[in-house]
C-alpha cells in the first residue's frame, strides 16, 4: 500500500544504500533530494546511484538537467508530485532521500512568494551585518550565500523586513505528517567513511569526470564549484598536489557533514544507528505493506 517516509543524514551516511535496498525489497519508489544528482553530466562527484540502480528502481529527481541549466526548490516540489502520483497509482511506498535538507524543509513548510535574488555586489559579511541590523530574527548562517542573497533580494524589492515578508506570504507545504528517519553516526567514524569515500571517488575517475566538465562548461557555474569538483579544478590548474587534492575534498566534505548535521536538527526525526536502520525500516515496511 502507499505510504511515504523521508530518510535523511549527512553525506556518506549510507542513505542511498538503505533507500535502494528497501526499494528493491518492497518495490518502493525513490525521490532523490540532492542538488547535484539532478545534473546529467555529474555522476561521480554527486555519488549518484549507479546505472544498475537507476535501471532497476523507479527514481525521481535524478538526471533532469544539464549543468548550465538553473533550478530551484520548485523543481523538487514538482518531482515529488510526480513521484507521489506514480506511487499512489500503483499502491507503492515512496522513499524521499537526500542530504539537501533545505529542500525537504521547504516541502514541509511551504514556499513563500517569489522574489528575485539580489544582484548586489555586497559580500556575505556585509549582507550579514545588514541583516543583523535590520532583521535579527532571521536565522541564517554567515556562509549561506543563497539565503543571504534571497534575504537581500526581498529587502531590496519590498522594503519589508524579510522575516515578516516570508511569514506573511508563506504557502502550505506539500508534505504533511511525514515520518522522518535520520541515519546517525559517531563523528569520528563518519570522518573515516568520508576519507574512504573520497579515495574511492578519485579511484573511480573523479578527475576524468572533472576534466570533461571543465572542457565543456564554464568553470564558474555553481554546479562546477561544488565539493569534489572545485578542488579538482585547482589540481588540474597545477595549484595543488594530488595529496592536497584528496585532503581538501575530505576536509571540505567533513565540514559539509557538520553543517548538514546542524541543519537536520530542524526536523523532528527518529535517529537510527546505521547498523540497525535496515532491520528497523524493514519491519516498518512489512507492517505497512
From Swiss-Prot:
Residues of the site described as Interaction with substrate tRNA: 100
Signal peptide: none
Residue sites binding substrate per the record: 11-16
Residues engaged in binding ATP: 9-16
EC number: 2.5.1.75
Gene3D superfamilies: 1.10.20.140, P-loop containing nucleotide triphosphate hydrolases (3.40.50.300)
Highest taxon, organism lineage: Bacteria
UniProt record, GO biological process: tRNA modification
GO terms assigned for molecular function: ATP binding; tRNA dimethylallyltransferase activity
Matches recorded under Pfam families: IPPT
Swiss-Prot/TrEMBL catalytic activity: adenosine(37) in tRNA + dimethylallyl diphosphate = N(6)-dimethylallyladenosine(37) in tRNA + diphosphate
Cofactor: Mg(2+)
Ranges where the record places region Interaction with substrate tRNA: 34-37
Entry annotated with the keyword Transferase: yes
Record key words, sorted: ATP-binding, Magnesium, Nucleotide-binding, Transferase, tRNA processing
InterPro entries to which the protein is assigned, alphabetical: Dimethylallyltransferase, IPT, P-loop_NTPase
Function comment: Catalyzes the transfer of a dimethylallyl group onto the adenine at position 37 in tRNAs that read codons beginning with uridine, leading to the formation of N6-(dimethylallyl)adenosine (i(6)A).
Family (UniProt): Belongs to the IPP transferase family.
Cross-referenced NCBIfam families: miaA
Subunit-level organization: Monomer.
Protein name: tRNA dimethylallyltransferase
Annotated source species: Campylobacter jejuni subsp. jejuni serotype O:6 (strain 81116 / NCTC 11828)
